[in-house]
């Protein structure tokens, strides 16, 4: 199975890079895992609604360019469906069982995801109504993917 996380912007924080590297190493037992960064759109602090949509559209085009037709896409979105770790693990298992070998997770920039990216997504997933930095979300997501594989393997990581 191939798992990819597409994130907007370059990860700068050393502690997040280290955390993601640790989960990437652990995930190597279960899948081919990669993080793909697409450049964020430079924008002034105050934007009109039209300018905000323009930023999301440009970032969305960069995201969509990294997704192949056969990939199953999860968009991280506040309006997405919340899942327990066990439900998420079951989804990952079912996707693999039914022949999906390429799974992509998309994390938008500070303004969120474009309508085009949300439309391309096979499903939307939410980690709750909290607002988290999108850079931190990469590590949280990598941990949950690892947790899902550990649950499916019957290993004692998840309590």
Curated annotation (Swiss-Prot):
Record CDD domains: RlmH-like
Molecular function via GO: rRNA (pseudouridine-N3-)-methyltransferase activity
**Residues binding S-adenosyl-L-methionine:** 76, 108
Between which residues do disulfide bridges form?
Answer: none
Q: Which InterPro entries match?
A: Alpha/beta_knot_MTases, RlmH-like, tRNA_m1G_MTases_N
Example of a GO cellular component annotation carried by this entry: cytoplasm
* Class of this enzyme: transferase
Q: Does the keyword Metal-binding apply?
A: no
The compartments listed are: Cytoplasm
Keyword terms, alphabetized = Cytoplasm, Methyltransferase, rRNA processing, S-adenosyl-L-methionine, Transferase
Functionally, this protein is described as follows:
Specifically methylates the pseudouridine at position 1915 (m3Psi1915) in 23S rRNA.
Q: Which NCBIfam families match?
A: PRK00103.1-3, tRNA_RlmH_YbeA
What does the subunit section of this Swiss-Prot or TrEMBL entry state? Homodimer.
> What protein name applies here?
Ribosomal RNA large subunit methyltransferase H
Native source species: Ligilactobacillus salivarius (strain UCC118)
Gene designation per UniProt = rlmH
């Amino acid at each position: 199975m191939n798992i990819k996380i597409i994130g907007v912007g370059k990860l700068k924080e050393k502690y997040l890079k280290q955390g993601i590297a640790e989960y990437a190493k652990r995930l190597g037992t279960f899948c081919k895992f990669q993080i793909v960064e697409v450049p964020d759109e430079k924008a002034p602090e105050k934007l009109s609604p039209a300018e905000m949509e323009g930023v999301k559209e440009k970032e969305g085009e960069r995201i969509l360019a990294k997704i192949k037709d056969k990939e199953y896409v999860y968009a991280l979105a506040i309006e997405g469906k919340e899942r327990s770790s066990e439900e998420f693990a079951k989804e990952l298992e079912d996707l693999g069982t039914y022949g999906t070998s390429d799974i992509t997770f998309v994390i938008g920039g500070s303004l969120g995801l474009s309508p085009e990216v949300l439309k391309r997504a096979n499903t939307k997933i939410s980690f709750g109504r909290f607002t988290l930095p999108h850079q931190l979300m990469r590590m949280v997501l990598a941990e949950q993917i690892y947790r899902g594989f550990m649950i499916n393997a019957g290993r004692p990581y998840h309590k």
